[in-house]
From Swiss-Prot:
This protein's record includes keyword Protease: yes
Domain Lon N-terminal as annotated: residue spans: 26-221
Function: ATP-dependent serine protease that mediates the selective degradation of mutant and abnormal proteins as well as certain short-lived regulatory proteins. Required for cellular homeostasis and for survival from DNA damage and developmental changes induced by stress. Degrades polypeptides processively to yield small peptide fragments that are 5 to 10 amino acids long. Binds to DNA in a double-stranded, site-specific manner.
GO molecular function (one): ATP binding
Protein name (database record): Lon protease
Organism: Desulfatibacillum aliphaticivorans
Annotated catalysed reactions: Hydrolysis of proteins in presence of ATP
């Protein structure tokens, strides 16, 4: 029930009805957020102009006023249809004008009435009313008396729960003997919505009105009881906390008397010991002690205490001064590297050089290497071998798909669940501040609205800055200069230049077939035999079988698919032995079909014959070197150049440069000039779903274009790579070693390369150079002379104006299905 001054409540009930003569037409005062019941005395604050005029009009005459409630209290100037029809005829008892211009009016409800009509009065509301009289109930029946008693008891219960029940209120309630008066009294003091209070007010029958009030009183009893329970629970909780605190303080006092430490004191002492043993730098130690002091002043159950504890745990567990001792025996390190990996001499020499310098200069900073090469050549496993050779711990962090800078630098401690970045986590895992830290797939880092992780790596991978690497979580510098960082990538194109500049790039090219056979015999076969539960004597795979697997069952620069095929052989043999069949099993080249099925790859040049408009280029992709086929055909049109196969801008420009060269030298190349005006030229690079770009397909495009225009076929055993200019000059390219391996896998015997790439032939393995013939050129004319075969039959030039129903141009030979490749090199 709403709070009501006891004097007002008693005055309300003691007021006599006095048979006052209430006029039929009264000024009306719209009231907000309250329903004024009969016999109710209530102060009203009046501030609206119309309302003030209505009060003035009532005071000027007989003080009678009609009070009606607005349907929406937020409406400042309500219309007649926004005011309830039923209201109270009231009399003004007192008026007080306030300094702010408002008027405080004390009114008493006299009788219920309803609006008959509004009289015309623009400056205020004036209404004609009809008084509503309740019927005389006479003697009350038992049911009504029981209802009244129930309502009174409920009211006393509510006031009792709230601590507001007084003898005066009890006396007032006991003195009411009319159900209508009781209903009005209780309803006026309940926290009811305007619609609920108005519904009770408009109920004329006193018993029905009391029944409605009884329902709301019952609801209020439940709410008051629930509120009392909540308050009691809160008080109990507070009492328990106070009791716990008191007992805890007593326990501390007892422990101090006995010379023993409590749990919190013990925790603080443990952290102090850990901070001392961690041998932190000065700045980190000061931060740790400051946080420990905060923890000491906190209540053990404080919400921030776990966050501070977690931070201190990280500070004391990070290896500030813990380091493994390097194995500086260069001979032993070389043996370990040779034991784990075949070839890769450049990388092994670089590691041994570092160990030699480290032996002479123990304070040398760790190198930052970047291994670049196709998948499966051993970049990741090489990192493990380097760690083993140096006697260091190894940690691998995969950067592929990371888009959040916080993965590198960590989250600030203000965030819930914050942790240090992956670099600090890795060092804690290794328990050493000088591990071999491999960051895999650095070329596949992403970036989004959360930041750019590659930019966060700039500090970590810069030897001039990483001695004071700042992790957002630790918020104190950490020295990374002793860490040997190794990154891996398939290509350097997507690595930001600023990051690439901080790393020493070492290219790991693909393996030759002979190298694959040797690696398979020394490493892959023994490993798969062991993993599949076999003994070395159970299975023997011949060298020819391994060579056939490398050339006809796989086509890759690395070794992953070859190892999978070897694993397939071992599993099939394991099954036979498990079924009780006796071995040993000899796997030869001729028996591979029985175990692995038909060959999956065939040398592509074995399936083709020289064709017009088809030239073979060489591409350098993430997966190594590949053959790249370029198809050109002519069709009647208006001399347009059509390019398809998802060619990038550089390749499109190469095609236009090739066309410009052909048009400029049409006489020398014996090209009919009418072809450029009456025929469209379509250049297509198969595997259209894969984007391709790069300048090194220039001479291949020129060769295919000239072949189609002169109808001279292109030799099918020649591949070519080189950039072309509109003057016909052939410019150098990159990735010669990888492209040579790709040509060899494709069955190509001859490669045309730019003259300026001749010096790079020394990097191509000797066994590859023996199987390939290299032709160096400096001009496109030399390329065409070597690649184009004589025309089979001289063709008559097409007419300028073909007839309306002209026959289609003579169909070229069926173009071969090109092997899927990605893009020409940069």
């Amino acid at each position: 029930m709403a709070h009501t001054d006891t004097d007002d409540l008693v005055g309300l009930l003691d007021a006599d009805d006095q048979n006052l003569d209430i006029p039929a037409t009264l000024p009306m005062l719209p009231v907000r957020d309250v329903v004024v019941f009969t016999h109710m005395i209530i102060p009203l604050f009046v501030g609206r102009d119309k309302s003030v005029r209505a009060v003035d009009a009532a005071m000027a005459k007989d003080r009678f006023l009609f009070l009606a409630t607005q349907m929406d209290g937020a409406v400042e100037n309500p219309e007649s249809d926004q005011i309830f029809k039923h209201g109270t005829a009231a009399r003004i008892l007192r008026v007080l004008k306030l300094p702010d211009g408002r008027v405080k009016v004390l009114v008493q409800g006299l009788a219920k009435a309803k609006i008959v009509r509004y009289t015309k009065k623009s400056d205020m509301f004036r209404v004609r009313i009809e008084l509503l009289h309740e019927e005389d109930l006479g003697d009350l029946d038992m049911e009504t008396e029981a209802l009244m008693r129930n309502v009174k008891e409920s009211c006393e219960k509510i006031l009792g729960l709230r601590g507001e029940l007084t003898p005066d209120v009890t006396m007032v309630l006991d003195g009411i003997d009319h159900p209508g008066r009781l209903a009005d009294l209780v309803a006026s003091n309940l926290n009811l919505k305007i619609e609920e209070a108005q519904s009770i007010f408009e109920t004329i029958d006193p018993v029905q009105r009391l029944l409605a009030v009884n329902g709301f009183v019952s609801r209020e009893v439940e709410l008051s009881a629930m509120q009392a329970r909540i308050q009691s629970s809160v008080r109990d909780e507070i009492s328990k906390s106070q009791k716990d605190y008191f007992l805890r303080e007593q326990m501390r006092a007892i422990n101090r008397e006995l010379g023993e430490m409590d749990e919190k004191t013990q925790e603080i002492k443990e952290y102090q010991d850990k901070i001392r043993k961690a041998k932190m730098p000065k700045e980190a130690k000061e931060e740790a002690e400051r946080q420990l002091k905060r923890l000491e002043q906190m209540h053990p159950e404080a919400g921030e205490a776990p966050t501070v504890r977690t931070y201190l745990d990280w500070l004391v567990e990070v290896p500030w001064k813990k380091a493994t001792k390097d194995t500086l025996d260069i001979k032993k390190a070389k043996e370990i590297l040779e034991e784990d990996h075949y070839g890769l001499e450049k990388v092994k020499d670089r590691i041994l050089e570092y160990l030699a310098v480290r032996k002479l200069n123990p304070k040398m900073k760790g190198p930052i290497l970047c291994f670049v090469g196709p998948p499966g050549v051993g970049k990741t496993s090489l990192g493990k071998s380097i760690a083993r050779a140096m006697g260091r711990k190894f940690y691998r962090l995969s950067l592929g798909g990371i888009r959040d800078e916080a993965e590198i630098r960590g989250h600030r401690r203000t965030y819930i669940g914050a942790l240090p970045g992956r670099i600090i986590q890795g060092l804690k895992h290794c328990k050493s501040n000088n591990p071999v830290f491999m960051m895999d797939e650095i070329d596949k880092i992403g970036a989004d609205f959360r930041g750019d992780p590659s930019s966060a790596l700039l500090e970590a991978l810069d030897p001039e800055q990483n001695f004071a690497f700042s992790d957002h979580y630790l918020n104190v510098p950490f020295d990374l200069s002793s860490v040997m960082f190794i990154t891996t990538a398939n290509m350097t194109d997507t690595i930001p230049s600023a990051l690439l500049d901080r790393m020493e790039v070492i290219n790991l090219a693909g393996y030759t077939e002979n190298e694959k056979v040797l690696i398979a015999q020394q490493y892959l076969v023994p490993r798969q035999v062991k993993e599949n539960g076999l003994k070395p004597e159970d299975i023997t795979i011949s060298g020819n079988a391994l060579l056939k697997m490398a050339t006809e069952y796989t086509s890759e620069s690395g070794l992953r698919n070859l190892e999978r095929e070897i694993g397939t052989l071992c599993r099939k043999v394991s099954r036979k032995i498990a079924e009780g069949k006796k071995g040993p099993y000899q796997i030869t080249a001729s028996s591979l079909v029985k175990y692995l099925g038909l060959e999956k790859f065939l040398p592509e040049m074995d399936q083709e014959e020289p064709q017009i408009g088809l030239a073979t280029g060489l591409a350098w992709t993430h997966w190594g070197g590949e053959a790249l086929y370029i198809e050109t055909t002519l069709m009647r049109g208006k001399g347009e150049l059509v390019l398809t196969g998802q060619l990038g801008e550089v390749m499109q420009e190469s095609a236009r440069a090739a066309l410009s060269y052909a048009r400029t030298n049409e006489d020398e190349l014996e090209i009919d000039p009418d072809l450029f005006d009456n025929f469209d030229i379509h250049i297509h690079v198969p595997a259209g779903a894969i984007p391709k770009d790069g300048p090194s397909a220039g001479i291949a495009m020129t060769t295919a274009l000239v072949s189609a225009l002169t109808e001279r076929p292109v030799a099918n055993d020649i591949a070519m790579t080189g950039e072309v200019t509109i003057r016909g000059r052939v410019l150098p390219i990159g990735g010669l070693r990888e492209k040579s391996l790709g040509a060899l896998r494709a069955g190509i015997k001859t490669i045309i390369i730019p003259e300026k790439n001749k010096k790079e032939l020394s990097e191509v393995p000797q066994q590859v150079r023996r199987k390939l013939k290299y032709i160096t050129v400096s001009h496109v004319n030399e390329v065409l002379e070597k690649a184009l075969l004589p025309a089979e039959k001289k063709k008559a030039p097409p007419k300028k104006k073909p007839p309306k129903k002209a026959a289609k141009p003579k169909a070229k030979k069926t173009q071969p299905k090109a092997k899927t490749t990605e893009a020409a090199d940069k």
